[in-house]
Amino acid sequence: MMKLYQKIVLGVCIMSSIAFGSVLPKYESKILENGLQVVVIPLHNKSNVIETNVFYKVGSRNEVMGKSGIAHMLEHMNFKTTKNLKAGEFDEIVKQMGGVNNASTSFDYTRYFIKSSTQNLNKSLELFAELMQNLEFIDSEFQSERDVVAQERLWRTDNTPSGYLYFRFFNTAYVYHPYHWTPIGFMTDIQNWSLQDVKGFHETYYQPQNAILLVSGDVNPHDVFSGAEKYFSKIKNKGEIPKVIMQEPIQDGIREAYIKKDTGGIEWLIMGFKTPSFTHKDQVALEAIGDVLGGGKSAILPSILQDKLQLASSVSAYNMDMIDSGMFIIIATGNAGVSANALKEEILKQIEKLKKTQITQAQLDKIKINTRASFIYSLESASSVAGLFGSYFVRGDIQPLLDYEKNLESLNTKQIQDVAKKYLVLDQATTLIMRR
């Protein structure tokens, strides 16, 4: 791995992300000798606010059956005792400097951030470098935090109808790939992790060569690169990063499951269709289809199922783009006395209609206007800019983001129809119904 980095010409590589007419801010990027990629996105807004992020290229996608949820557990452990910090001291230091911090674990990556004033840049870098190299893994802290995670699993998944339905959906939709479980993991795995399991996961994946340091906001790139060199350049890598080799087999038929759960007499439906990687050219059209079907009260499914037929109390549709095969998801909650099968029948009817009849140009224009507005809004704060850019850098390809506006502008009604025909295929659908 290091031989590869030695071939890279070191130094600042200024990457302009502004194509003609683009509203994306510019970014600058540098790769340190140990492989850590440092990205700076100055916003020039004189806000004196920055967000310092460390993205690790590891999520539940990198776990194995029997050890699910470890990436999320490590996120919890990462704020415990280190060589130079007591448990809780990280949070206290951030609080004392007037900042806020948090973390999240997804299917594809883990994100840590500190939002602070610009003058606290170096302290934020120092804190994150400490977590990367000096976490101590004390058994008593591990045991108590495991209990916290188990309670989170109960609260967000087992005892919440929507959370449980979502978890069981992925259990059904993916049979081989680690997307088979959501980042919280299975309860039996949570109960049976060892401290060494979590420590080994940290040693394997929390390495400079597997991380992105990203700072956005009112900041000078030179200060970030200088600070990154000071605090991170001497952290050594410990070994090769294992590649995810599992690929979900092509789905060769309908998958359906029925779940018994106390839902208060209300029936729930979730339906999904496999989609390609986040890098695929069809992603913009899939996002638009999500807006057409479920993006707001005037979208097709809410207007038909909720307003006209009064079958559902809520219905949504959206596209999940991931490193490997993603998912286009539709979720509906029935009104009292309405069966999930009735919801399913009407949803499939509307999908087939979309595939047979192109949406109007006026509908597409409205989607483009709303999407552009949301996109511009996402570039207003250091936090949202970091989240947007970081989600592409950490998954290994920034180009889909750089091309996004151009691809949205060129999107036409026939493309939407063709992409709907290509992916919203009934005999490749996964459907779960939950009822008492």
Question: What are the residue ranges of the model-derived segments?
Answer:
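Positively charged n-region of N-terminal signal peptides that target proteins for export
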Residues: 1-7
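Short, surface-exposed beta-strand/loop micro-motifs that present aromatic residues
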Residues: 28-29, 37-43, 199-204, 253-261, ...
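Charge-rich, well-structured scaffold segments of protease-associated domains
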Residues: 31, 91-240, 277, 308-309, ...
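Boundary at the C-terminal end of the N-terminal hydrophobic targeting segment
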Residues: 19-21
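Bacterial N-terminal signal peptides
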Residues: 9-17
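M16/MPP (pitrilysin/insulinase) zinc-metallopeptidase core fold and M16-derived inactive scaffolds
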Residues: 51-114, 181-183, 295-311
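Mature N-terminal segment immediately following signal peptide/propeptide cleavage
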Residues: 23-53
